[in-house]
Amino acid sequence: MKRISIYCLLMFCALLTASAQQTKQLVILHTSDTHSRIEPIDLHAADPYAGAGGVVRRATFLKDFRTKNPDVLLFDCGDISQGTPYYNLFRGEVEVRMMNLMGYDAMTIGNHEFDFGLDNMARLFRMAHFPVVCA
């Protein structure tokens, strides 16, 4: 009986080892300091990033990237707000809705998330389909 138990334990360990050899790749993407950049930077702006940025480009990149890399985590490091009239008019709602559509997994807060006060920040967090984390 003891031999059968040891044999079963060894077989279990062998099967566990065999299954552990299958590796997966996890990709972590993050955005940071997007500052309400819903539209691309004006093509004619005196800016090295003129014509770049914007939610449509980001969403397209993420869709294409996830097609080729199914195991992706997407985070934002804060400061999604402040910087354009979108934030001044809608107080972060546009930004959070876009992040929901792009499938963010989590975000943390930056200093500009406090710009319209704690009540507004709490409202945005309730709208988010992802956790807002901070240490």
Q: Where in this protein do the model-derived segments appear?
A:
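N-terminal catalytic scaffold of extracellular/periplasmic and nuclease hydrolases
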Residues: Q21-A135
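Sec/Tat signal peptide C-region and signal peptidase I cleavage site
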Residues: L16-A20
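Positively charged n-region of N-terminal signal peptides that target proteins for export
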Residues: M1-S5
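Bacterial N-terminal signal peptides
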Residues: Y7-L15
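General helical structural elements
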Residues: I6-Y7, L62
